[in-house]
Amino acid sequence: MSKLYGSIEAGGTKFVCAVGDENFQILEKVQFPTTTPYETIEKTVAFFKKFEADLASVAIGSFGPIDIDQNSDTYGYITSTPKPNWANVDFVGLISKDFKIPFYFTTDVNSSAYGETIARSNVKSLVYYTIGTGIGAGTIQNGEFIGGMGHTEAGHVYMAPHPNDVHHGFVGTCPFHKGCLEGLAAGPSLEARTGIRGELIEQNSEVWDIQAYYIAQAAIQATVLYRPQVIVFGGGVMAQEHMLNRVREKFTSLLNDYLPVPDVKDYIVTPAVAENGSATLGNLALAKKIAAR
């Protein structure tokens, strides 16, 4: 049998594990809730043990913060996460000790960003944001992740507040920073403003324009900092069909023709990989890449 590659998308609420071939075709995929580290890792190892004879490598895209510095004593750890029981867990070590193959470790949004570059074969510079329960971003420049001492935390940049939030005294929901992108635009901020879960809020509610205002600011930051070919927005908040055009309109207004960018319909987009599959595709490609070293 030809070589197989593994993908672990380690989310705060669920794990998605998959095995694929050299063409990134998925042969088997499972998902299960993220419970305790012991229980979740045990299920992960059991899944990949079935393919051990042909498994060449595995890539992990994880919730964080995580330590991706291979020279660090805590490389492979989930570090200061607020998720109960998962802080300071040697995630990679606990999984890899049962195998004799290389493992690649990065953030879940980095995996998604990489998957989107694979799906968009002519794109080498891209920023991928997930806008859901939390917010994060992965940035690729010339086919490589950016970052020095560690991964970026784009969800925790401070935002210019929307006038309605100022008027109503809404300061954000992030327990660390309040008025950062995550605190002002992630899913919990919708419910905090309205008392209604996001999926139940009417499309004509002004709260969507507030969300779009903050998400558009993120696109402005990505544009002026990285000058990417494309900015991709995924996650549950952006799954609302009306949101993409709202963000494009706010972005165009805020940028105010300061820099030349592609047509906004080609520049600010949703994922090219269906069914939230960007991270799995990215992980399979990253696993194949490290296996070839």
Swiss-Prot record:
Pfam families: ROK
EC numbers: 2.7.1.4
GO MF annotations, alphabetized: ATP binding; fructokinase activity; metal ion binding
Cofactor annotation: Mg(2+)
InterPro entries with a match to the protein in the record: ATPase_NBD, Carb_Metab_Reg_Kinase/Isom, ROK, ScrK
Keywords linked to the UniProt accession: ATP-binding, Carbohydrate metabolism, Kinase, Magnesium, Metal-binding, Nucleotide-binding, Transferase, Zinc
The protein's enzyme class: transferase
Activity control mechanisms: Inhibition by zinc ions.
Binding, Zn(2+): 156, 174, 177, 180
Binding site for ATP: 133, 188, 236-240
NCBIfam families xref list: FrctkaseScrK
Family: Belongs to the ROK (NagC/XylR) family.
Protein name from the UniProt record: Fructokinase
Source organism phylogeny: Bacteria, Bacillati, Bacillota, Bacilli, Lactobacillales
